[in-house]
Amino acid sequence: MTVLCRLRHCHLSTPTLCRRFHDARVYKEDKRWPGWQVVVGIETHAQIKSRRKLFSGKITGTNPDEPPNKHVSPFDAAFPGTLPKLNSKCVDLAIRTALALKSDIQHRSSFDRKHYFYSDLPSGYQITQQYAPIALRGQLNIQMPNSSAVPVRIKQIQLEQDTAKSTLNPRKRISNIDLNRAGAGLMEIVSEPDLRSPEEAGMFVRTLQAVLRAIGASDGNMEQGSLRCDVNVSVNRVGRPPGTRCEIKNLNSVKFMMAAITHEIIRQRAILESASDLETCTVPQETRGFDENTFETYRLRSKEDAPDYRYMPDPNLGVLVLSQDRVQAIRDSLPELPWETRHRLREMYALSERDIDVLLSVDSGREVTFDGEKDVDGSGAVAMTHELLGQLSARKETFTDNSLTSDHLGELIDLVQNGTITGTSGKYLLRHMLAKPSSLRPAQITQQLRLTSLSSFSSSGHSNPTSTTDQELTTLCQAAITALPNEVAAVRAGNKNVMNKIVGRVMRESRGRADAKGVKALVEELILGGGDKS
């Protein structure tokens, strides 16, 4: 492995030095492209979870089912003489995001106009924070599998307007413009070029999504357009300066983003490897798009064709001043962050990393609480929680919206763990309680639905013939033995694999109320111990 030293060639100018030796990470070769290093930076545009737009009082119209141009103010449509009014809720959520990403809050920031002409921008400029953003110098740690945490620096966080939505009508050769989204609040979160693979880029976006959702700043749904990514990719020989970066615009899923980065690495590497002189060969600096059908990037424009945005301060918006008290109040109200949730689930409930990943991958999964003490092996709580999250996902509900309280969930888990009901019955009981909310406790519903487990052996390992459930289970086992004489003969001849057929019959007849291991032990005792009197 090779370490790139920042102090080499000290005679270089400072900008060149920063560009050339910004990488302090230890190089680890990727077998997919040996001898080459990949450098990736990401710009994410997260739609702020505010009911109102950033500079007007209109409702944020991001619901695709709503009719077009329903939530539009004169300012959103760029009527002459209209003035912006900053939404303080958007500012607070941007501060909350900056604190979660360990950024330096700028107590004085300002807004600029970014000029360009396009049909989805009525005013001809976008209000953003190019020169004095609301936050600088943050960090987000990402956890790759079988690796230590990778720190990714956040260059800046800035507030800006979203554009309108344009839809091309190819038959009429016109674009339909919907201004419902125009003026909605966005946060642009810009990372430093600290990522070294498509997988790291994907993990960065997933981790950022988890943070934004945990603090309530954004839905982070790429499929619905509330989180969009632009990536900058460059390739260089190991030990050489970073190559020319190419930007890939408007990636709307983690899968497509990783595919776009992979194709761009292969494309740039092919250009450099085909050159006769690697010292003088460079990749053309371009802005590129991504074809979701072919999984390839394509050229949009070159550096020479790039527009001059002519940034200038917005004269209608003054300096945004944030007091220490305001920032501290937001800091004090920060909820539990994903890495804190992960630590709590690991320490309090002894969950595995895989189970924690399942919980954190589902919206509101972090809100699940377990009543009582830890499981000995964690299996009971995990199985019921997986079932709960699956049912809520199918119903499109969150944990806080459903009628099942954490107290009742804890009691249900206890019923499974102490053997009162089987895991199969526990899942059935959970589905019943979600479908038919009731004030009855899980134990009462268990009796009502006759879900009590058919126990076969006590903790001492011997059956209890006086138990009603034992007698019922013994009757079911004897009935199965009587109905399957050929299988019984095979078991007595030493072929114990055939016993599974007998056990399966008992399980079906018990409707999931019997434990498979207990049934197998009881069937074996009845057959080999002479319990079959047929």
From Swiss-Prot:
Record Pfam families: GatB_N, GatB_Yqey
Localization in the cell: Mitochondrion
Top-level EC class as recorded in UniProt: ligase
SUPFAM superfamilies from the UniProt entry: GatB/YqeY motif, Glutamine synthetase/guanido kinase
Keywords assigned: ATP-binding, Ligase, Mitochondrion, Nucleotide-binding, Protein biosynthesis, Transit peptide
A molecular function GO annotation: ATP binding
Reaction(s) the record says it catalyses: L-glutamyl-tRNA(Gln) + L-glutamine + ATP + H2O = L-glutaminyl-tRNA(Gln) + L-glutamate + ADP + phosphate + H(+)
SMART domains: GatB_Yqey (SM00845)
GO biological process, alphabetically ordered: glutaminyl-tRNAGln biosynthesis via transamidation; mitochondrial translation
InterPro entries in the cross-refs: Asn/Gln-tRNA_amidoTrfase_suB/E (IPR017959), Asn/Gln-tRNA_Trfase_suB/E_cat (IPR006075), Asn/Gln_amidotransferase (IPR018027), Asn/Gln_tRNA_amidoTrase-B-like (IPR003789), GatB (IPR004413), GatB_Yqey_C_2 (IPR023168), Gln-tRNA_amidoTrfase_suB_CS (IPR017958), Gln_synth/guanido_kin_cat_dom (IPR014746)
E.C. designation(s): 6.3.5.-
Transit peptide: 1-28
GO terms for cellular component: glutamyl-tRNA(Gln) amidotransferase complex; mitochondrion
Subunit (UniProt): Subunit of the heterotrimeric GatCAB amidotransferase (AdT) complex, composed of A, B and C subunits.
Family listed: Belongs to the GatB/GatE family. GatB subfamily.
Function description: Allows the formation of correctly charged Gln-tRNA(Gln) through the transamidation of misacylated Glu-tRNA(Gln) in the mitochondria. The reaction takes place in the presence of glutamine and ATP through an activated gamma-phospho-Glu-tRNA(Gln).
Name of this chain's protein: Glutamyl-tRNA(Gln) amidotransferase subunit B, mitochondrial
